[in-house]
Structure formats: C-alpha cells, structure tokens
C-alpha cells in the first residue's frame, strides 16, 4: 500500500510548481489520497522557487519602507543634537530629497546595465551605513552629507524595486504593483512603530536604529540571491530622452506626491489652527491617511483587475477631491477624519498604476522611465511644503489646501489617455 501510494505521489513531487499553468496537478494522486496530495502541494509551494522569488521581490518594498520609517523618529533627536532652528532643520531635510533625486537617474542607468540586484544591494548598503550615523552625528554639515547619502541609497533602491516589480507584473500577466507598494507602506508604519516603542522603553537612538538596521541587513542579505540579476531593458540600447507621455506621467506623480506631502506637513497645522485640535492628537489625521493608503494598496491589484486602470485613476482622483473638501470644510471631527481617510484611499494606487503605465511604453527604457517619473514626483515632496506655505500666506491655508485637492482633477481628466495611450 505504501509503495503504491508513493508511486502515485511521485508525479506530484517531480512536477514543477508552475508547469502547464497549474499548481501541482495530479489526478491519480488526488484520488488515491486527497489529504496527502494537499499536504505535498502546500509543502512544495512553500519551497517552490517562484514562491521564494515572489516574496523576495516583496521584501525589497518592505525593506525600503522600513528604511524610511526608521528615519522619521530620528528627526527630533538630530535637531536637538545639532541645536538647529526650524529653518535650519528644513534645509537639512531638503538634503534627503536632493540626494534621492540626484541618485535616481544614475540608478535607472545602472539598473539597465548592472541589474536590479546590484542596485538594490548598493542602495541597501548605503542605507545601513547611514542610519547609525544619522542617530549619532551632531554637526550640521556631517548630518547634511549623511542624509543626502541616505536619500541616494533609498532613491536607488526605490528605482530598482519598481523596475523589478514591473518585470514581475509583466511576467505574471496580472496587476501586482499596488500590492508591492502596500508592503512599502506597511514597512514604513512597522519600522516607525518599532523605533517609537524602543525609544519609549528607554533605548538610545543608536540602539533603536541598530535593531532596525540589523533587521534590514539580515533580510537583504538573505533574499538578495533571489532578486532579478538583470534590468528590464537591453543594456546595449542607446540613451533616450524622456517622451512626452513619460513627462506628463511624471507631472501627475508630482501632483500626487504634492498631495501626500500636504497631508504629511500641513494636516496637523490645519487641524490645530482651524479646528482647535490639540497638536498632541492632530497627527492622528496623518495616521488615518497612512492606514487607508496601505489598505487601498493591498486591495489595489484586485480592484485594478476588475475595474481597470482608467477607472481606478478616475475614482482615486475623485475620492481625493471629495476627501479634501470634507477634511477642510466640515467641522465635526468624525467627518474631517473620514475626509483624510478618503484622501489616503484615493491616492493609494496612483503611483503604482503610473509605474505600470510607463513600463508599458516603448519610447524609452523602462528603467529610465521609472527613474524620471520618480524623480519628478519627488519634487512634489521637496517643493510642496514651501509652495503651500507661500500660497497660504497669500490666500490663506484653507484655500491653499483646497487648491491642492483640486489639482487631482488633472488625474481624472488625463486618466483615459495616460492608461490607454
């Protein structure tokens, strides 16, 4: 009996996980012992190379989010060690964005020539080296250099992971980018919470960040061998200037990240000034925004498959505009918190969908196209706070934020052409 059962299971054990478009199909084994066949299928699927590679790609997004989330709790400590005024701190924080923007075009070219794995490892190494320095340095010039290099590392790994995610999405023939970016959001939230918990328990900033760096480095070294060793394009392909479509998508990403930056930098100030919400709890608006953004990304692939990219972009843009109107114009706190929740939900799938859009165009290499839209998008986070502050000085904060929300009309009006063109 054992020999017979074993012989019937051999085809299942030998079968490749994704052969003939099916997972572990063996009718005879299933009829002979369905329970054992199920156990073998589960065990093999966990060990299957495709399963491991998929989770390795997902880990890259998680680690990138963890890196960014680890820096946020360090900001007030860096300010106090260096004795910085608010204006000096603002200039210091700009170094992160400039480092990212300068590194992204180079990362796009390196991804094409050296591969996603190479760029991910370089970016991860820079991140792991700079985070401990950001937790200990007290000189403004040294902090500026370290933060710029940290931004360069994060910008590089951002380009590589999006190119890699694009290739995986192409290979599987179904939407996957939103889920990948959901893990980025989850990594940022979990890392910030872990750092906050360690600091609350009395750990020094260096010890707290060392724990996070150890996690990042350990996971990076474990899954690096499973990352894609090449880029999405032919390394011998000539350099191509950004096409009109790529530039327009970049501008739309600029608007999306400007909106995200507005919620990050101005939501607490607005709630405190206009609704008299205490600053100690006004930051809850951004927490609600972040949670709904993560939830929207985890459901985004499912929605995109059923609704299509065009409807997802149109619906997302409308949700953001309605959310801004609720958050800014309505007085009861449940309603304006619901507004911030709608903003996060509407904005959640914008960047992942645009990554897929530029990956499908043929006017320039996908790696460079993603670097272009990411670089232009980062300008929204860099310039956004200053632009909103200037507009608030001229017309008022309420009106300035309403104008930011209205900018999402550009996404609604161009969605069909961008997603289909």
List each language-model region with its residue ranges.
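Short amphipathic helix-loop junctions that connect adjacent transmembrane helices
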Residues: 73-86, 265-280
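Symmetry-related core transmembrane helices of the 12-TM Major Facilitator Superfamily/SLC fold
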Residues: 206-223, 401-416
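Primarily marks hydrophobic transmembrane alpha-helices of the MFS/SLC 12-helix fold
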Residues: 117-120, 313
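Intracellular juxtamembrane helix-capping segments at the cytosolic ends
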Residues: 156-169, 349-362
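Short hydrophobic/small-residue motifs within alpha-helical transmembrane segments
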Residues: 97-98, 185-186, 290-291, 378-379
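Helix-to-loop junctions at the C-terminal end of transmembrane segments
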Residues: 103-115, 296-308, 392
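C-terminal ends and interior cores of transmembrane alpha-helices
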Residues: 125-138, 320-331
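Interfacial helix-cap and linker-helix signal at transmembrane-aqueous boundaries
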Residues: 78-79, 110-111, 197-202, 271-272, ...
């Amino acid at each position: 009996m054992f020999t017979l059962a074993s012989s019937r299971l051999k085809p299942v054990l030998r079968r490749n996980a994704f052969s003939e478009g099916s997972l572990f199909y063996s009718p005879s084994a299933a009829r002979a012992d369905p329970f054992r066949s199920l156990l073998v299928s589960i065990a093999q699927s966990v060990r299957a190379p495709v399963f491991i590679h998929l989770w390795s790609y997902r880990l890259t997004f998680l680690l990138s989010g963890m890196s960014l989330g680890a820096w946020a709790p360090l900001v007030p400590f860096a300010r106090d060690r260096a004795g910085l005024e608010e204006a000096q701190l603002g200039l210091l924080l700009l170094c992160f964005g400039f480092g990212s923007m300068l590194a992204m075009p180079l990362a796009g070219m390196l991804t094409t020539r050296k591969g996603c794995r190479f760029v991910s490892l370089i970016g991860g190494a820079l991140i792991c080296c700079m985070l401990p320095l950001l937790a200990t340095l007290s000189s403004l010039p040294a902090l500026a250099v370290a933060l710029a290099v940290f931004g360069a590392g994060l910008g590089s790994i951002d380009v590589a992971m999006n190119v890699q995610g694009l290739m995986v999405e192409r290979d599987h023939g179904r939407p996957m980018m939103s889920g990948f970016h959901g893990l980025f959001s989850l990594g940022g939230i979990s890392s910030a919470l872990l750092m906050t918990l360690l600091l609350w328990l009395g750990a020094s900033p260096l010890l707290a960040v060392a724990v996070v760096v150890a996690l990042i480095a350990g996971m990076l070294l474990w899954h690096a061998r499973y990352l894609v060793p090449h880029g999405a394009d032919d390394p011998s392909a000539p350099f191509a200037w950004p096409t009109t479509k790529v530039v327009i998508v970049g501008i739309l990403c600029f608007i999306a990240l400007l909106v995200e930056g507005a919620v990050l930098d101005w939501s607490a100030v607005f709630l405190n000034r206009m609704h008299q919400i205490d600053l100690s709890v006004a930051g809850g608006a951004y927490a609600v925004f972040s949670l709904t953004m993560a939830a929207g990304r985890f459901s985004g692939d499912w929605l995109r498959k059923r609704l299509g990219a065009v409807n997802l972009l149109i619906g997302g843009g409308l949700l953001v505009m309605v959310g801004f109107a609720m958050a800014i114009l309505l007085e009861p706190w449940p309603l304006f918190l619901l507004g911030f929740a709608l903003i996060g939900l509407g904005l959640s799938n914008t960047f992942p969908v645009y990554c897929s859009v530029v990956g499908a165009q043929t006017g320039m290499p996908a790696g460079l196209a993603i670097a272009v839209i990411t670089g232009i998008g980062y300008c929204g986070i860099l310039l956004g706070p200053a632009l909103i502050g200037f507009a608030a000085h001229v017309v008022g904060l309420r009106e300035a934020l309403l104008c930011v929300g209205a900018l999402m009309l550009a996404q609604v009006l161009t969605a069909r052409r961008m997603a289909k063109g």
